[in-house]
Amino acid sequence: MAFDAAMSTHEDLLATIRYVRDRTGDPNAWQTGLTPTEVTAVVTSTTRSEQLDAILRKIRQRHSNLYYPAPPDREQGDAARAIADAEAALAHQNSATAQLDLQVVSAILNAHLKTVEGGESLHELQQEIEAAVRIRSDLDTPAGARDFQRFLIGKLKDIREVVATASLDAASKSALMAAWTSLYDASKGDRGDADDRGPASVGSGGAPARGAGQQPELPTRAEPDCLLDSLLLEDPGLLADDLQVPGGTSAAIPSASSTPSLPNLGGATMPGGGATPALVPGVSAPGGLPLSGLLRGVGDEPELTDFDERGQEVRDPADYEHANEPDERRADDREGADEDAGLGKSESPPQAPTTVTLPNGETVTAASPQLAAAIKAAASGTPIADAFQQQGIAIPLPGTAVANPVDSARISAGDVGVFTATPLPLALAKLFWTARFNTSQPCEGQTF
């Protein structure tokens, strides 16, 4: 009888371990709260039934929520009330904006986890949405719905993080992906409306209007990191016909091996010692990084036509004649040449910078409409050489010798870098790495 009791206790213990493992998805969840000695006793066949009984009770007590489901807590009640409030307010409008707001709110607040993994990010997002719905009293107006949608657009990154890291059930994951896709589409339209209104705009918080020389104030947008793209690449089930990621993030992107080098590329040193592909002249880094010389006038850059058919920069023979003269004299000669060049170019004013929106949602600023058109075509899949040639911009051949090497401490946008791997413009390279490899491979080689 004692032997039968021991076997029965051991079988109950094994059944409890399997139950906890299946319900939590963690094969080691049953060990939570047990000492190393107790864990060893479970897998030892000579352990007495009294000790197994104590361990069994301890496991069941530790995971009591799996055996006795708790009643709906206050947070679930708050989520239900928030959804009801949003439905009541947004139902007064028969507009796409209101419907999208309700879709996003419902998808977030109705999301459920299979396990506790990633639950913190979901709960934090749900609490922020609940609080936003509670404090807003203008959701029943078109202006309030649009302003609330800007708030939701600012949560694109958080929604993406929840989808990528939280252990959601299938229905919640599909609903959140659909909401993210629709919200991403809406964010592109909202960006276009802001561009049409011009640079002088006042934010919803009553901030003063920006100056005429600054970019228009736009809604906060998710940063183009690779979490969501890697999620979509690893889980093809999320890319159903109705859940395609907008903006062409999966569009054809030119291969790095077939991409020619570009003129006036600046080099930047990576922490690992390599060099990264640098910016096209006049293209601003995403996020408004304060890089020097990014928005220099077109007249300040070397003419793209000042290269011979081999890609070598054409120089005035007088430059070689005065190569050994003192620095002051050469500086005076350059100033006189700049004044003469300025007189010759005064008839055509410099072209204004042009804003370009990349397929991943980032915005860069090109120094001229021609350069903007070339960047847009290259980002859409056109080979970079063809994209620049269509705009009349000549590109030096790969391997072109460096005529004027400069010290690495003086590198700025517009300088030429030499790499052992083919360089790309920073914005295009970032998109290429994000969509294809989810990692960046630094180029190695000498930087000038």
From Swiss-Prot:
Record InterPro entries: DUF4226
Residue span of region Disordered: 187-221, 243-270, 291-361
Biased segments, Low complexity type: 243-261
Family from the record: To M.tuberculosis Rv0025 and Rv0739.
Protein name (Swiss-Prot/TrEMBL): Uncharacterized protein MT0029
A Pfam family per the record: DUF4226
Biased composition (Basic and acidic residues): 187-198, 307-334
Coiled coil: none
